[in-house]
């Protein structure tokens, strides 16, 4: 059960119900308020059917050390893309370098299933909003959500990259950010384990990072070890 870090009431309730907090996950969110320059070194296009095998190999290799990850086959990954509402292969992108796929990720519009908003805006966000309100008079600034305002965002899903080429993933993130702006979204976000190398790449785009706690309850035996932990973004919504 993921619980937002500031939600003390829920954490207290689940603690009383016998659940234990065993892991943190982070949700970095890039504010898509201005377009990024992209590198001509890479070819970035939607994935095509004949590339699925290579994409699956990259995803499986990238996530091989993460608990909770189940490797894909080409067939199960195609089914996965089709079965998640408002996802699909047309929203899955691959980065090619010298005809080799070196990074990939999908964009999922989960807003068709659920909306995110602050029922009570954190104090830090209120402070940032005041500061950015002044700065907005002289330059473009990231949008800060108001209390009760629905967040317009896209989830980054099923990402992976050749760890020898993190700049390929950065190029893809910039491309997805530009697409998000064209689609009039305010944020591009995902959910990751703190040890995920993807987080280090995403930090180069200066995201807002929030923390969620994973609470679990064992009905038999010891609590599971979730270190490092594969985060399926569908679990944050569905």
Regions inferred by a protein language model and the residue ranges of each:
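Short secondary-structure boundary micro-motifs
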Residues: 76-80, 144
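A short helix-loop-beta-strand connector motif used in the catalytic cores of GNAT acetyltransferases and
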Residues: 81-93, 207-211
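Hydrophobic, Leu/Ile/Phe/Ala-enriched alpha-helical segments that form helix-helix packing faces
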Residues: 59-63, 81-84, 176-181
């Amino acid at each position: 059960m993921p619980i937002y870090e500031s939600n003390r009431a829920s954490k207290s309730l689940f603690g009383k119900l016998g659940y234990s907090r065993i892991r943190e996950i982070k949700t970095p969110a890039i504010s898509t308020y201005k377009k990024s320059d992209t590198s001509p070194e890479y070819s970035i296009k939607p994935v095509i059917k004949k590339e699925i095998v290579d994409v699956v190999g990259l995803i499986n290799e990238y996530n091989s050390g993460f608990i909770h990850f189940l490797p894909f086959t080409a067939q199960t990954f195609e089914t996965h893309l089709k079965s998640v509402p408002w996802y699909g292969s047309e929203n899955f992108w691959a980065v090619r370098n010298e005809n080799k796929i070196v990074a990939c990720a999908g964009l999922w519009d989960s807003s068709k299933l659920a909306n995110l908003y602050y029922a009570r805006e954190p104090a830090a966000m209120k402070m940032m909003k005041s500061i950015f309100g002044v700065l907005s008079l002289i330059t473009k600034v990231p949008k800060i959500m108001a209390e009760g305002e629905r967040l317009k965002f896209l989830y980054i899903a099923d990402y992976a990259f050749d760890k020898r080429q993190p700049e390929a993933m950065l190029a893809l993130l910039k491309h997805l950010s530009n697409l998000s702006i064209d689609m009039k979204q305010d944020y591009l976000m995902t959910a990751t384990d703190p040890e995920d190398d993807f987080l280090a790449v995403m930090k180069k785009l200066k995201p807002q990072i929030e923390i969620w706690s994973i609470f679990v309850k064992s009905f038999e035996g010891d609590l599971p070890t979730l270190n490092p932990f594969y985060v399926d973004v569908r679990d944050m919504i569905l």
